[in-house]
């Protein structure tokens, strides 16, 4: 499975009109985003995918998702997809909160019939360890057809319309 680092990139971001040569930023964002923040953002999106898997299972069990979880997901999407916050410390705190939420939802649902990395991943304690794990969460983390990968990114970015 290839990822951003396998491709020799410190980061990979192509979500805005400022991307380098219209192809994506791979060392430092034209917008000022650092590789550190880009990788923490990738891991945050990865985590909310796991939260969403548990949320889906919770709904299937006829239970409700607490509004604070919805607000958290909205906040993460806004923070990561609109490039409004390049503070690594804030992203680390959001990541820690994401793991707490995921653990809480897991406790509410029990084991679910989804064993993807988004669900099974447990966030490490330190930023250094988080950054070591971040490549698996990068945009290029899955060995997918480029069209499918692009469609997934489009759906992710379109989620902001509903916030």
Where are these regions (language model features)?
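Long, low-complexity or tandemly repetitive, helically biased scaffold regions used
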Residues: 103-149
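Conserved small/polar residues in nucleotide/adenosyl-binding loops
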Residues: 161-163
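Extended, charged alpha-helical coiled-coil/arm scaffolds that mediate oligomerization and mechanical coupling
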Residues: 146, 156-157
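N-terminal-proximal low-complexity accessory segments that begin disordered
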Residues: 3-57
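Peripheral terminal and linker regions in Fe-S/redox and tRNA-modifying enzymes
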Residues: 3-7, 64-65, 88, 92, ...
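Long, charge-rich boundary regions
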Residues: 42-86
């Amino acid at each position: 499975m290839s990822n951003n680092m396998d491709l020799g990139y410190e980061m990979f971001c192509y979500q805005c009109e400022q991307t380098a040569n219209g192809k994506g930023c791979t060392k430092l964002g034209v917008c000022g985003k650092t590789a550190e923040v880009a990788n923490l953002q990738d891991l945050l999106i990865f985590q909310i995918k796991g939260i969403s898997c548990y949320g889906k299972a919770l709904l299937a069990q006829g239970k409700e998702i607490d509004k604070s979880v919805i607000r958290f997901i909205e906040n993460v999407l806004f923070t990561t997809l609109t490039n409004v916050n390049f503070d690594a410390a804030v992203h680390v705190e959001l990541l820690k909160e994401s793991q707490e939420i995921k653990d809480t939802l897991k406790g509410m649902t029990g084991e679910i019939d989804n064993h993807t990395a988004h669900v099974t991943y447990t966030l490490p304690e330190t930023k250094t360890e988080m950054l070591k794990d971040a490549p698996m969460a990068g945009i290029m983390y899955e060995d997918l057809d480029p069209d499918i990968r692009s469609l997934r990114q489009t759906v992710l970015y379109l989620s902001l319309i509903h916030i």
